[in-house]
């Protein structure tokens, strides 16, 4: 474990976790996340960002270096379905683009409490359908996301299958929240070890998102779904000391049970979605290197081009 990670773990436990445990003002939480992103997240040199609409949904496209515009990663940002945005995660999109040679599309999906389930999933589907209508080959489209966005990526895999849409080339998920029944053993086992996420707030966040929907619904809790045979290959990264450790393990097991190729990668001392600190934290850069190689492999070979 690097010295910088040790220091970050200390600060998160002393400052961030107590704040998240007591904060109730959604607008204030959003502002705090936005400020943290501006202060702490590093944008790769030469990163390019372009806003537009895709399937009626506002998106931000991130790219860096030489990319092939036919290769696309749709990345769903995390934030418990109530905060976060393409802006808070655009640096991550650019960093992934640099590593896999694809452009990264970050949808501005609707958030709670203004818009409950299934609004986020509807927006995710709209983006994917728009790419398919535009002639993009699903063999060159990947889904990805972190935390709540990671769970949303797997929900979209299930939703696409149910609607007769083709599966994506692969899925990459960082610390995904995949079981909203809140029955994962690690929620309690790692409650004290997790330096950032307070277990005591998850039920409130979950209930606001569901607004009465059944947490057992596979589109809500993909870790409880029966995936169709031969699901897309998946790379799942998580921490051994975060409360969502078992959410990551469970979705991986479900995919493997359906015959899917799954790469599970666990870090021993990292915090929830440490990958956001790319450029500052060597453990984040190592994780993104692994994710980029996985995406490059499964998105297929094409001829890259500038911008």
Language-model region placement:
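Alpha/beta-hydrolase superfamily serine-hydrolase fold, recognizing
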Residues: 50-307
């Amino acid at each position: 474990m690097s010295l910088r990670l040790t220091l970050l773990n200390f600060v998160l436990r002393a400052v961030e976790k107590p704040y998240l445990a007591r904060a109730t003002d959604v607008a204030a939480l959003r502002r705090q996340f936005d400020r943290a992103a501006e202060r702490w997240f590093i944008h790769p040199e030469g990163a390019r960002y372009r806003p537009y609409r895709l399937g009626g949904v506002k998106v931000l496209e991130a790219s860096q270096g030489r990319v092939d515009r036919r290769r696309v990663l749709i990345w769903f940002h995390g934030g418990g379905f109530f905060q976060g945005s393409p802006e808070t995660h655009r640096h991550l999109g650019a960093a992934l683009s640099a590593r896999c040679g694809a452009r990264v599309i970050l949808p501005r999906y609707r958030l709670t409490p203004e818009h409950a389930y299934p609004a986020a999933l509807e927006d995710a589907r709209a983006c994917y359908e728009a790419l398919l209508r535009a002639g993009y080959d699903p063999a060159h489209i990947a889904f990805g996301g972190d935390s709540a966005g990671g769970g949303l990526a797997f929900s979209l895999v299930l939703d696409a299958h149910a609607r007769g849409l083709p599966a994506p080339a692969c899925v990459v998920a960082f610390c995904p929240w995949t079981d909203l029944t809140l029955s994962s053993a690690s929620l309690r086992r790692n409650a004290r070890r997790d330096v950032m996420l307070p277990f005591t707030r998850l039920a409130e966040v979950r209930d606001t998102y569901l607004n009465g929907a059944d947490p057992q619904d596979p589109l809500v809790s993909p870790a409880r779904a029966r995936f169709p045979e031969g699901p897309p290959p998946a790379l799942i990264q998580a921490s051994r000391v975060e409360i969502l450790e078992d959410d990551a393990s469970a979705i991986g097991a479900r995919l493997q049970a359906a015959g899917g190729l799954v790469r599970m990668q666990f870090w021993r001392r990292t915090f929830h979605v440490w990958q956001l600190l790319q450029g500052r934290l060597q453990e984040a850069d190592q994780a993104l290197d692994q994710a980029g190689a996985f995406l490059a492999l499964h998105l297929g070979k094409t001829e890259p081009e500038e911008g």
